[in-house]
Each structure stands twice: as structure tokens, then as C-alpha cells.
């Protein structure tokens, strides 16, 4: 059994005090919670990806990179990486960099995302979100495992012998 602590980083008033932290203070609180989770023996800390209010978790690789710099053991989870919304090449670059900086502590969870606000923001339809996710995952996985990738798909420009190599 593994024990994880996961957050979507809501940015709302505290239910007890009624106080809403500044964005910077809320991010500091998330990092402090991850540090405490490591001290308490949790196996992993996850940051979800959301692109709408009341969440401020639109950049999990950035948040997880800061957590990686402040911790040494805890596994770093995405909860989830929404490849239906993201360019898989850019996602690969961000997460491969994070995995290297963290000493290999990254654990990726891939999902299609949810919510109409996110789909609207990235011009993804309910009809294409699953196909986008599958195609994005296929390219992402190839970039992670192969040194040279040539790619042609439906939802992003072709890659002609991509030599991206971070992993």
C-alpha cells in the first residue's frame, strides 16, 4: 500500500477563519504541506491540473519542481496530466526536465481532464477529447522512450525526426 496526498490547489477562503491567502502564500502553503507529507512518511505528493477558478493548479510541473527542490524522498505525482489539452511535445519537455531535476521521483498519471471551461480555453470539444488524449499519450510515450521520433497525427503539427532528448 502506498500513501499519497493530492491537491488541486483550491484558492478560496479558509472554511474556519474566512481568510483567503494571497496566491503566493497559497503556493507556499502547498509546498509546506508537501514537505510535511515527506516528514510524516507519505510515499507521494500529487498536484492536479485545473484551468479554472477556484483552482490555481494550471502549472503542475512548475509546482512539482519547487516541491522537488525542497524535498528529497517523496514521489512527485501528477493528478492528472491532461494530454487532451496539452501539446505532448511541450508536456514531455516539462516533465522530463522535472524527472531529471528530482532524481527520477516523478510519477505521471495521464487523463483527459474535465470541465467545459478547460475544454473551451483550449478549444477541445467533447467529441475530440478522448482522441486527443490517446494521440497525445502515444506521442508523449514515444518521446519518453525513443531517441528519434517522426510523427504525424491529427491534432498537432508533424514532427520530422525529432531529436529531443531529455529523458
Language model regions located:
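Conserved small/polar residues in nucleotide/adenosyl-binding loops
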Residues: 164-166
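Catalytic metal-binding/acid-base residues of hydrolase active sites
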Residues: 51, 81, 113-115
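N-terminal beta1-alpha1-beta2 module of alpha/beta enzyme domains
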Residues: 1-71, 75-78
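Active-site glycine-rich loop that binds ribose-phosphate moieties when present
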Residues: 157-162
Amino acid at each position: 500500500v502506498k500513501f499519497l496526498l493530492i491537491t488541486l490547489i483550491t484558492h478560496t477562503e479558509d472554511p474556519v477563519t474566512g481568510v483567503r491567502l494571497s496566491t503566493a502564500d497559497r503556493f507556499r502553503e502547498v509546498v509546506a504541506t508537501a514537505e510535511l507529507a515527506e516528514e510524516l512518511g507519505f510515499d507521494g505528493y500529487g498536484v492536479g491540473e485545473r484551468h479554472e477558478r477556484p483552482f490555481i493548479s494550471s502549472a503542475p510541473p512548475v509546482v512539482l519542481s519547487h516541491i522537488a527542490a525542497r524535498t528529497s524522498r517523496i514521489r512527485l505525482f501528477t493528478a492528472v496530466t491532461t494530454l487532451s489539452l496539452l501539446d505532448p511535445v511541450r508536456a514531455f519537455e516539462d516533465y522530463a526536465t522535472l524527472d531529471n531535476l528530482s532524481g527520477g521521483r516523478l510519477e505521471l498519471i495521464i487523463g483527459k481532464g474535465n470541465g467545459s471551461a478547460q475544454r473551451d480555453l483550449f478549444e477541445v470539444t467533447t467529441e475530440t477529447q478522448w482522441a486527443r488524449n490517446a494521440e497525445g499519450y502515444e506521442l508523449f510515450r514515444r518521446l519518453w522512450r525513443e531517441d528519434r521520433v517522426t510523427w504525424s497525427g491529427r491534432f498537432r503539427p508533424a514532427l520530422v525526426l525529432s531529436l529531443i532528448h531529455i529523458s
